[in-house]
Swiss-Prot record:
Reaction(s) the record says it catalyses: guanosine(46) in tRNA + S-adenosyl-L-methionine = N(7)-methylguanosine(46) in tRNA + S-adenosyl-L-homocysteine
InterPro entries: SAM-dependent_MTases_sf, tRNA_(Gua-N-7)_MeTrfase_Trmb, tRNA_methyltr_TrmB_bact
Alphabetical list of NCBIfam families matching this protein: tRNA (guanosine(46)-N7)-methyltransferase TrmB (TIGR00091)
GO (cellular component) term, any one: tRNA methyltransferase complex
Documented EC number(s): 2.1.1.33
Residues annotated to bind S-adenosyl-L-methionine: E68, E93, D120, D143
Top-level taxon of origin: Bacteria
Name under which the protein is recorded: tRNA (guanine-N(7)-)-methyltransferase
Length: 238
């Protein structure tokens, strides 16, 4: 297991170490995952380029676009794409087995409204997604980095909230979910302080799981054991 970093330099040429919110755990691809990448990447894969996508060209139509950061094995993302054929979906995942699994499931489901990146989400968001182009950004069950000394690695920080705000349309929604209560409190604190957002919760805290987010097997098992999951939804208003 190795931490993923990118070499960056400031204007004076000083090396800057960029902290990542993930660690790369590259398992072996199964035969099915490898075959799915080979067969489906030409139609569903997006090769990273530091120029903004023209979404109407990518999908061949004008439609609301939902982007998910870190889709894991992709089962819930494929289900969402299948359930909402009128919307476009983009998933970003750094772990190759997850990409292969997602593409395999998407092919079996017959979805045509899903595209996938195998790349660092921050670089994709910063360079490949146009400002004001997304209807929803999803961040489900990110690494909580529960040790206090690792809190700086949490992806939900003030700068990240501003980056997401820029990428959303006015009226677009940033939807987060976590099964770590303390992280939900951190998310809420960051987002309440972030300019240009309005909490969609009626009481200013969390929201019930919306219908568009499928209940995962892991989550269903957690419910049976009395474990909580916290959803937060913030709308871009400025």
């Amino acid at each position: 297991m190795s931490e993923v970093t990118t070499a960056e330099f400031n204007e004076e040429g000083k090396y800057l170490r960029k902290i990542r919110s993930f660690v790369l755990r590259e398992g072996r691809l199964t035969k099915g995952q490898a075959q799915a990448i080979e067969s489906q990447w030409p139609t569903m894969g997006l090769d990273y380029s530091p120029t903004p996508l023209v979404l109407s060209d990518v999908f061949g139509r004008e439609a609301d676009t939902v982007l998910e950061i870190g889709f894991g094995m992709g089962a819930s993302l494929v289900q969402m794409a299948k359930d909402a054929p009128e919307q476009n979906f983009i998933g970003i995942e750094v772990h190759k087995p997850g990409v292969g699994s997602c593409l395999s499931d998407a092919a079996i489901a017959g979805v045509t409204n899903l595209r996938v990146y195998h790349h660092d989400a921050m670089e994709v968001l910063e360079h490949a997604i146009a400002d004001g182009s997304l209807a929803r950004v999803q961040l489900f069950f990110p690494d909580p980095w529960h040790k206090k000394r690792h809190h700086k690695r949490r992806i939900v920080q003030a700068e990240f909230a501003e980056l997401i705000r820029r990428k959303l349309k006015i009226g677009g929604v940033f939807h987060m979910a976590t099964d770590w209560e303390e992280y939900s409190e951190h998310m809420l604190e960051v987002m309440q302080a972030a300019p240009g957002y309005q909490n969609q919760s009626s009481d200013g805290t969390v929201v019930p799981r919306p219908d568009h987010r499928p209940l995962t097997k892991f989550e269903a098992r957690g419910h049976r054991l009395g474990h909580g999951v916290w959803d937060l939804m913030f709308e871009r208003i400025a």
